[in-house]
Regions:
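Cleavable N-terminal signal peptides of Sec/SRP-targeted secreted and luminal proteins
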Residues: 2-17
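Hydrophobic alpha-helical membrane-embedded or membrane-associated segments
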Residues: 8, 305-310
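Residue-level recognition of hydrophobic positions within alpha-helical transmembrane segments
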Residues: 8-10, 22, 302
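N-terminal, motif-rich segments that launch catalysis or mediate targeting to/interaction with membranes
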Residues: 16-141, 148, 153-256, 262-273, ...
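Extracellular juxtamembrane-to-transmembrane boundary of type I single-pass membrane glycoproteins
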Residues: 288-303
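Juxtamembrane cytosolic interface motif at the C-terminal end of transmembrane helices
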Residues: 313-323
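Cytoplasmic C-terminal tails of single-pass
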Residues: 324-328
Length: 328
């Protein structure tokens, strides 16, 4: 299935989602980023967004999730399963330190993916489709790496196997789902009149008034990971009574856990949006400079040839005039 056809389906399905850290969170990150793109950067990435999406970067932000979902992409989801491990990394339980040589073997983790696709996006040896996919993956993975549990513990698979109850609901859930969906759902319902656009405007204002976004480096992927790991150990895995969560017991989380963590979600969405914009703007500049570098030697040669022709022509005219004067 082509990207254009798949995204025509997904974009029109997107209105069915009410809330969710998945599609809504990624959409917000992309939307925040696009609001800060340089004109030239926006024009460049628009070349890779299917025409029916009208340049909407947020509409492609969940593509890497959709292509490995058999319900959304039933015909060839299995062709993309190789990309699953690129969405996250895991560290030893309560080790609280990411070590790439231990936790990202052969670059098969989210840090390796961020490095790879930022390079492929501006690699002249990659064709249009490869660069388009690189953009889609990059937009998504910048969002993923700012979700703390995408840098969670190996023993419970990033919170998937930590089971319990959230806000006294009768059906059990897992910690990953609490972070993917539940906290953001309640946050938007309570504080933004169930309106995602109001939430976006709030995040946008937050983004321009946060000290922690000053002097950001556009591709400090290790720093982004270290931040998520720190939040996992200091905040995400602690229940309402600051007792560690694990797979040995069911959790019961409520108001205290919610109030402690919704500001962190706001912060991570804002950081992801800002950093994605910085990354794309810088890659656009790097791409522009790369376009001229391979032609520089040729340009110098041509310039030298033209200069030599000019010198010989001027010399020829001078000699002709001098000979003509001698004859007279």
């Amino acid at each position: 299935m082509s990207i254009s056809i798949l995204y025509f389906i997904l974009f029109n399905q997107e209105i069915l989602y009410v809330f969710g850290w998945g599609p809504i969170g990624h959409s917000l990150v992309a939307r925040l980023a696009q609001s800060q793109l340089d004109f030239s950067t926006n024009s460049w990435i628009n070349n890779y967004i299917p025409l029916n999406l009208s340049g909407n970067l947020s509409a492609i932000a969940s593509w890497p999730d959709e292509i490995i979902d058999p319900n959304k992409n039933p015909f060839d989801y299995n062709k993309w399963l190789w990309s699953h491990e690129l969405h996250f990394l895991t560290i030893p339980d309560w080790n609280c330190k990411y070590i790439s040589r231990r936790d990202c073997l052969n670059n098969r983790c989210i840090e390796g993916a961020l490095k790879n696709y930022s390079e492929r996006l501006i690699d002249n040896n990659c064709d249009y489709i490869q660069q388009q996919q690189a953009l889609f993956f990059l937009v998504h993975f910048v969002g993923d790496v700012h979700q703390p549990l995408h840098c969670g513990f190996k023993g419970d698979f990033g919170g998937h196997n930590v089971i319990g109850f959230f806000f006294n609901k009768t059906n059990s859930t897992n910690l990953r789902y609490v972070w993917n969906v539940e906290i953001m759902n309640i946050h938007i319902n309570r504080h933004f009149q169930s309106d995602v656009n109001l939430y976006y405007e709030y995040l946008k204002s937050l983004m321009f008034n946060q000290y922690f976004l000053i002097n950001e480096t556009y591709n400090d992927y290790k720093k982004w990971i270290d931040e998520s790991v720190s939040y996992v150990c200091k905040q995400v895995y602690l229940d309402d009574n600051n007792i560690k969560l694990d797979i040995s017991r069911n959790f019961v989380l409520g108001e205290q856990y919610f109030n402690r963590n919704w500001p962190l979600i706001d912060q991570r969405l804002v950081q992801a949006g800002r950093r994605l914009a910085l990354l794309l703007n810088q890659l656009s500049k790097n791409r522009s400079s790369k376009k001229f570098l391979p032609d520089t030697p040729l340009f110098i040669i041509i310039l030298c040839i033209e200069l030599a022709i000019g010198i010989f022509a001027a010399l020829g005219v001078h000699l002709y005039k001098r000979n003509k004067q001698h004859r007279i």
